[in-house]
Amino acid sequence: MRSEVRSALVLGALAGLNVLVQRSRLNPDVLVPAGAAALLAGARASGLSSVELGLSRRQSARALPGAAVAAAVTAGAVAAAASLPVASGFRDDSRYADPAAAVRSAFLTIPLSVAVPEELLFRSVLDALLRRHLGDVGTTVVQAAAFGLWHALGAASLSHDNAGVAKAVGSVADGRGRTVTTVAGVVLATALAGLGFAVLRRRTDSVLPGIAVHWALNAAAALAGGIPRRRRASRATTW
């Protein structure tokens, strides 16, 4: 089967998986990892090597120290940004209303159901297939665009979940325009993140650093989301 056809099939599979995740009643925390495992198995069966996929032992061993440093720097940067007064609204996120939920998300849900499977889907399987016929630049652009669109269906609720996003979007749009603005902003932001993850994939020749940074970015944001409520709870119980 031609590489172009296989790439198109994987892009179609990603679109189908995304619809299932966002519109079905199936558990996304199980569905996304299962989908990633299935596509990875299919990629290996089609002839892609572990080196092409960025998953060989040698690649991972060489990338591990850098991945650890990158994760630490990312988490520190998010923590520093979250501590700024201007970011207070963005920390107020209803998805992490329960501090225990924020911790669970940071150390269980995000690594296992977000960072690892998404990096396998986009920077391993899709990346390896696209590089066979598009080259580095074309591959980077296509997978970044696909990564941005992956987040489109789930983006609409963000203006309701996050106080900072709601305020920012509300200052430029109202009604249906709020939803359109939120979705467009999320797609653009995640596409840019996809570009960054792709560059990391090229520079390190491994998927591991992308997984580490992806996890650190989302986990630190989740933990920061519980800060306002932890502080309010502390004040409420102080006599």
Located regions from the model:
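Membrane-active amphipathic alpha-helices enriched in small hydrophobic residues
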Residues: A13, A37-G42, A68, A72, ...
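Transmembrane helix-loop junctions in multipass membrane proteins, especially transporters and channels
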Residues: R23-L26, L48-V51, A82-S94, A155-A163, ...
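Juxtamembrane helix-loop-helix connectors linking adjacent transmembrane helices
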Residues: S50-A115, D127, R131-R132, A166-R176
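Transmembrane helix-loop-helix hairpins at the membrane interface
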Residues: R104-W239
